[in-house]
Amino acid sequence: MPYPKSMVEPMRKELTRLGIDELKSPDDVDAAFGAAEDETLLLIINSVCGCAAGGARPAVAQALETGPTPDHAVTVFAGQDVAATDYVRDTHLPGIPPSSPFMALFRNGQPVYVIERKHIEGREPAAISADLVEALQAYCTDEAPPSDAPSRPDLSSSPNAGGLPSTFQSIS
């Protein structure tokens, strides 16, 4: 059962006020991805969880402010826009385990960079934003991305994945 609309509305607005378009149905997903077929598109799977509020949404705001920006930015809300969320995962993210919050950068219709929940939990918005900015700099350009362009955040340099105990398990 979807979350109550009144509960998620403020969480939606944190992204829509940035100019990010909401996708509430599979038709919305098809239209957005069709419009971005030969361009870049940032997909954010929003969530009610604390790591979305304290990490993912602020990181997106910081990254878009820093730039560069994708040609399109869209969001679905897990637990609210159930059909759209399931459809975007099944259609555009095959083989990538579902998680929320979640971000994916697409270039020419293909996912080229993903930030999963496990890359968000226990990390500061600035660190998540830096990962996203690195991806935007690599892929949101007219030039071909460098051969060593990242596809996921590199957490190897941060001990215990952002200070989490080694026994911590993400609930992706």
Swiss-Prot record:
Biased composition (Polar residues): 154-172
Gene Ontology BP annotations: cell redox homeostasis
Annotated region (Disordered), positions in chain: 141-172
UniProt-listed InterPro entries: BrxB/BrxA
Domain of life: Bacteria
PANTHER family listed in its UniProt record: BACILLIREDOXIN BRXA, UPF0403 PROTEIN YQIW-RELATED
Family to which the UniProt record says this protein belongs: Belongs to the bacilliredoxin family.
Protein name per UniProt: Bacilliredoxin SRU_0242
Organism: Salinibacter ruber (strain DSM 13855 / M31)
Biological classification of the source: Bacteria, Pseudomonadati, Rhodothermota, Rhodothermia, Rhodothermales
